[in-house]
Amino acid sequence: MKNKEIQEQRIKGYFLQATKDLLKSEGLQSVNVRNIADRAGYSYATLYNYFKDINDLVFLCVYDFYGECEQHVREHTKRQERGIKRLRASIRAYVDFFVQYPGIFSLFFMENLGSFKDKGRATEIISFSLDKVCEEEWNYCVSKGILQVEQVELIKSQIRHATLGLLMLYINQRVSFPYTELINRLYLQTNAILESCSPGGGRDGGGVSVHNSLISIKVK
Amino acid sequence: MKNKEIQEQRIKGYFLQATKDLLKSEGLQSVNVRNIADRAGYSYATLYNYFKDINDLVFLCVYDFYGECEQHVREHTKRQERGIKRLRASIRAYVDFFVQYPGIFSLFFMENLGSFKDKGRATEIISFSLDKVCEEEWNYCVSKGILQVEQVELIKSQIRHATLGLLMLYINQRVSFPYTELINRLYLQTNAILESCSPGGGRDGGGVSVHNSLISIKVK
DNA sequence: TTATTTTATGAACAATGTTCAGTATTTTTA
DNA sequence: TAAAAATACTGAACATTGTTCATAAAATAA
């Protein structure tokens, strides 16, 4: 009884890994039952013994990919000074992750979820992925009084939507500027959002001091 | 020589109209050569005498749809008071247009443009569509001193990206809130962006007075 | 070992994009 | 007007992809 379970999970894992590899290396347009099964070392028909349909399989990748995204952000920001600087670096690392794997962006934000079993959990992870990968830093900024707790939810959603909108235009090639320009615009808009909420009441009088740090930004 | 041209354009028009009708009524997933040709009254093979491929045909719709979007916004905002109020109403009307026709949103922002002939012009129209439908109002606000000319480009891009990000999440069902909540969040974020740029130097001291008008907002 | 259950598979079907050779229609020419 | 030529239209056919199903292969139980 238990062995059966283990073996089934193992084979599901082969298909899952094949799908993830394919999506990352060839993009979403190469993800189809025959290619997946080839990589997994099975016939395409076997896939249907383990997954309801290809949609089910593909959206299962979301959980793993979110984890990879989280780790990518952590590794690329750990040497940054805590606070606004690391927050900004986290947002950039998040963007970089999807620029590196446009197929994952399509999967996360554009692909029709169809009848995926737990749509709810997946969409929750997806839509708050940026918030989540920045969570520690949001908390840090609030705890240090860099950001005000009443404002932080609005700021989060501003940054979430502005970042995703910009990313969508870039990844789907609705804009033609190069990567460096993407990052410049990302910083500009991130700073504008953070700036608008500097505590203390007066313009430029708060503790965020986004402008100063802006000067030293250099795109990779 | 001239008649041939006219006739060819006429038949292209039948296919184009069929595609537009189909996209608006059934969505992008029903847009295929056989359905289009059925509606146009021709065989699916005939389509290839007039268009390179289906992608070419579908992206030709962008120009017409942009015009419809523009008109939709104009008609739904003409009774609004000029300035920030009409600006906000324009943004909402823009969002409403895509909520009504999600297939057009997919076409504009998500579909792979492939080898579409003038990618350049189409993507320009697409990515600046929100800016364009609000152009008169942006100009009005600047001319009346409601917004400062140096800030307006940054504000435009903030609103553009934040609006598209929110719309993407909503239309692709990555969030589960109802339409009324979408509009609430749209207003909240629009106001936050506009507020951050009130002229005069001090918080709440500028001429935008977004807060006051926020009170009277009622979602349809 | 033999019977039964489980697992894996290719054949086959449906939907869609595309090409092409042949048919129908229109236009040109004699 | 009638034959010839050019043009327009079409279904058959092929490729790709998702899915189902009968059956072969393998594992398990008797």
List each language-model region with its residue ranges.
Chain A
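Hydrophobic alpha-helical connector segments
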Residues: 74-103, 155-159, 203, 220
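Amphipathic alpha-helical packing segments from all-alpha helical-bundle domains
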Residues: 74, 118-144, 153-157, 164, ...
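Basic, helix-initiating cap at the start of DNA-binding domains
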Residues: 1-26, 30-35, 39
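Short hydrophobic/aromatic patch on the recognition helix
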Residues: 40-51
